[in-house]
Amino acid sequence: MLAQSHPEAILNTALHALAHEADWRAILDELPAPIYTTDAEGAVTYWNRACVALAGREPELGRDRWCVTWRIYTTAGDFMPHEQCPMAEAIKEQRIVRDSVAIAERPDGSRVAFRPYPTPLFDEAGTMTGAVNMLIDVTEEQSAVLLEQADRCRRLAGALYSRESNIVLKTMADGFERTAAGLKPDNDV
């Protein structure tokens, strides 16, 4: 998939369009990855068509804050409030955020793992005007990681003689497997 193999190139195209093209929306609409923008307070101001496929919903301009997804979870399965998501972090701290993976829950209950690329936008005077975020579907990769973690927990539980540790490790393994089973890649993006 092009978006997974060249995410930085796609993001650079979006950043160039936002900075230099009057018709930047048309350019971002054609990109193969979900991309959206916010104002400096985190209110969503634009989203491309690929966002709908990944999020499973149409974001509400001006109403949605920080993210276009319905709900977000950590890779451990813990609920992540939107105001704590990587985009919120990028805006609040006025810095690029990379190397994170999150899980989006769609309104239909399906989930997709994604790698966000939140990037603040600044005017010529250095004032932050908003941010752009690109979301890359990494569901298959994340599912494999979760299943590997489950296997590791089960092997460790088998090697230990502590009943309490075995229960904890088996519970963790079950959780990793449930999370992996709940992920559904978005084949349209």
Predicted segments, located by residue:
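PAS/PAS-like sensory domains across diverse signaling proteins
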Residues: 41-43, 53
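N-terminal capping loop/helix in small sensory signaling domains highlighted by a polar->aromatic N-x2-3-F motif
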Residues: 48-52
